[in-house]
Amino acid sequence: SFNISRNNYDNVPLGNGENENSGIITAAVAFNPTVPVRDEKGNYSTNPQMPQLPNPVSLLEINDKTVKERLLGSAYIEVEPIKGLKLKANLGIDRKYQKRKTYLPKTTQYGAAVNGQAYLAQEDNNDYLMDLTANYQKIFGEHSFNVLFGYSYQKFNTEGMSAGNQDFINDSFLYNNLGAGNYSRPPVGSYASVSSLSSYFGRFNYSWKEKYLLT
């Protein structure tokens, strides 16, 4: 069976940060309700009593989108080459991918301080599973026994990257042209990891008259 999903999110800064990092709820609660949304020049107004607090309406202009994709699948095959012997292979995959794109325009207080800020990040996770088993069962009169032997293997892959820039000429590029920013040291990072787990297992059961069991 396989299941594929894709979700798109328009993120809203609801966080409980302080000052220029305040989220919409914090800013709305603390902002002076008598101050108009925009001033006479059409810019977002600031709170005279708390100039470091962003205008809560301006935070709605932050462009912050996330895409999440997932593939979850499993399959198995079982054969019986001879009577009493069953061979089974079970395979599974869990792939998760997400990408986030953020742009803080100059109309926001924090974006104005840095002349616009863009950020991109993505991560890819791939997990694989393989189980192989051999199960043999035999009955001789009042005696019966069962032997199971198996091998299990799991592999985990993770890789990701992030990049950003600020100091843009205008807000039109959003996060689609990081090279247009003029920040002297734009942040760039990447990472990757691989790990695996393997094991062998076995079991032996002997029964006599279906009353006594040795394992």
Please give the residue ranges for each predicted region.
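Surface-exposed loop/interface segments of Gram-negative outer-membrane beta-barrel transport/assembly proteins
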Residues: 1-70, 88-199
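Outer-membrane beta-barrel channels and translocator barrels
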Residues: 80-82, 139-142, 209
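Generic low-polarity alpha-helical segments
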Residues: 2-4, 210, 215
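A conserved hydrophobic secondary-structure block that centers on an alpha-helix together
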Residues: 78-87, 92
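Exposed, low-structure sequence patches enriched in small/polar residues
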Residues: 90, 201-207, 213-214
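Outer-membrane beta-barrel architecture
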Residues: 74-76, 80, 133-135, 148, ...
